[in-house]
Amino acid sequence: MEHYNYNGKEIIGIDHGFGNIKCRHVVFRSGVKAYDSEPAMTSDALFYEGKYYVIGEDHKGFVSDKSQDEDYYILTVAALAKELEFRHITECEAVLAVGLPIQWIGAQKEAFRKYLMRNELIEFRYHGQDYLVRIDDVQVFPQGFAGVVQRLGDFKGLNILADIGNGTMNTMLIKDGKPMSSRCYTDKLGVEQCIIRMSNELLAVSGFAMPYDVCEDFLRRGNADLAEKYTSVMRKAAEEYSDTILTKLREYEFNPEIMRLTVMGGGACILKHFWNDDGCRVQYIEDICATAKGYELLALNNLKRRDT
């Protein structure tokens, strides 16, 4: 089992997405609902500070500040529960490695760090097991960059990186393996925008709202076991969304004749299935845990530098 432990501290990367929370080994939806008593219909509830939380039944809506309510804190505790369960660890000292959209990090980094560090000791119960975590530090990194940090050496010449999550698209230009800090952008063009477009067009055709899960699975797989009158509408919406993404990239001076394109995040599958790349030099990073893994590596490198 691969993970980083430095001087007795577990390094735990958490990618706080609007659609999903991703760690090195676990992925779950970002929905959270609190109950005063243990819910009868689930065995997957998290018990924390006197309340039960059902995690992952839906997605969290887009917010421009992830520290504005309690949800992302509870989702962080849930991420610790699920990742530590996978690692077979019930008590540890931890360094949390997290991130924010590129254009938000300057204004929100310190507030998000304080938000996640407000309790040094976190005690919770998950699947009948008690856990105790001492938060030693929280390190905050830019999204997108973290997902490719292990392969920057492969980014020869001019490259453009598009990290398409559920809420935002983070775009970064990379030249000879070095990110260009003046050419980083965040846009509200995440996968949810595609699903909203798809749902509205399906509603006009069918007269009923297609379940979110059906739309999501269609985008992930590139097809669905539905009547053609529905899949044709869904395909058209996905193709239009893909065109919107490419239009935005061209605004950022993407030129396929001289640049390579790398697409990652949940939206990578949409472009892979529904965009005609016309011979563009494009690679898709389909590991949706890549960013969380990158956060861990960046945090490990920081810890090592502090000790030199």
Predicted regions and their residues:
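Acidic, metal/cofactor-coordinating or nucleic-acid-engaging core segments within structured domains
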Residues: 202-205
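Nucleotide/phosphate-binding catalytic cleft detector across ATP-hydrolyzing
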Residues: 1-161, 178-193, 212-308
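Conserved blade-register residue in beta-propeller folds
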Residues: 23, 171-173
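Ser/Thr-glycine-rich phosphate-binding loops at phosphate-binding pockets of nucleotides
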Residues: 164-170
